[in-house]
Amino acid sequence: MGRRGYYHLFSDGFRTDVLFEDIKAFVAAMNIVALCYLKCQVRILAFVLMDNHVHFILYGTEHECMMFRDKFVHRYGMWFSNAHPVRRCSRLDFDIKLIDNERYLLNSIAYVIRNGIAAGYAYCADDYLWSSGGLYFRLPQRMEALVSSWKTVSDIPSTEYRRMFNTRDRFPSDWRITPEGFIWPGNYVDYRLVESLFKSSNSFTFFMGQLKEREINESLNINDQVSLPDLELREKAVAMSHKLYGVTNLRNLDVRQRIALGKELRREYRSSVKQIARIIHLDPKYLKELL
């Protein structure tokens, strides 16, 4: 069966094009996370979905964590194929790392929760919807007040259920659904375990305040040479594309235009080749030769 432990399951955004390009994709992925939890014998301590990569801190055997990975990749690929019949989903390559000491575990949890902040998407962790960030060390009464008006799974008619969740599998009837339409992570994330690991809100705040991105990225062999967050660089690229070519959808640029745009982004913002390639949808190896 294998020994259970804490694992960091992650994908590298520098190896992946955009995974979740709009709110519908994020909502679908959030519901898939909840479904994978039900299907696998893992405990989810923390997770975040970014537009081009994901992170999960899981407790289970390595085999159970890999099953979780495989189900997530399969389910999201199916959803993407149905939503975009003529396009292929970006390849989602997961790596897995055993977490072998307590301090690294606490740093890793904080790193995952901080991901939205580090990418420039939110001012604090609980502002970033597509994660477990808003669950930890919350006053129970306020948490209950927040979710008490939300629908539960039992409120959803069977005809709407399949359309909403893209599955015949049933979620527990008392699970809450957010106003955005995804299963609330508080239903399945083991945030109480996380609180017991940190022991106090002071300790949690301390670790959240530690800028460990470079240290964690190096331990995961992730390249973090980024001059601007993806969101900001993408906005700059769109504005530059509109100015140069009158085009705001970067996918509509031809190869020559993308190369020229990439050169301008490199000159103006000194971003890495991999980041620019991801933003303008070009093979980084091809772009590197040209830049």
Pin down the residues of each PLM region:
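Short beta-strand->loop micro-motif that forms the acidic, two-metal-ion catalytic signature
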Residues: N52-G60
